Amino acid sequence: MKLFRSNVGPFDLEVAITGVKMGDQLLQLGCGNGKLFAVLASKVGLTGHALGIDDKLAACERTKAAAEKAGVFAEVGHGNYAALNSNDSLFDLTVIHHIIGNMKPEQRVACLQETYRVLKPGGRCLIIEPALRSGLGALFRPSAIDPTYLTSGAEQGLKAEGFRAVRRLAEQDGAAFIEGVRPPD
């Protein structure tokens, strides 16, 4: 009798927490190596749409390659997080992946305002960011996150931009998952 699952994928936690499903309109800001985006994009299927945006060209190329390797139909673009080239109320889910804490305060505000604008009423914004270290971990590996962000954090930023039902969903494997919902009109 097997007590534990041994076939857990590298992004199963992220996929489960996002709740992304077939037919969703997905936006990911900050694609990094593109592997998380490729996995999330595979979940929306042909009836949904996945768009990944990164402000670094190299990250866009890595994300395109990861999506192609995974065999998913997805769109990847190079752009400014504070000026998204998308229609209002288009996305069901926005994932902000490991970028918001490294932005300057004015960029962070503009990014969250744009995220709010492009989300459908009732749409969800999920911020995935490094969990803050404490104890010896904080001494030996200090955070590169903006100190002004550390005092308020993602929860306060989401609330300030009008998101509701803001909550910290989990802290696991060095990552924190914070969710906010755009209220229905």
Regions found by a protein language model. Give the residues of each.
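A short acidic, Gly/Pro-enriched loop at the edge of an enzyme's catalytic core
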Residues: 82-94
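Helix-to-beta-strand junctions that scaffold the AdoMet/dcAdoMet cofactor pocket
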Residues: 45, 103-105, 119-121
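Conserved alpha-helix/loop element of class I SAM-dependent methyltransferases that forms part
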Residues: 5-24, 39
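A short SAM/SAH-binding and catalytic strip from SAM-dependent methyltransferases
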Residues: 93-107
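A short glycine-rich, Lys/Arg-flanked "PGG" loop and its adjoining helix->strand segment in the class I
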Residues: 109-121
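Class I SAM-dependent methyltransferase SAM/SAH-binding core
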Residues: 25-27, 32-83
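C-terminal alpha-helical "lid/dimerization" subdomain adjacent to the S-adenosyl-L-methionine
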Residues: 4, 123-179
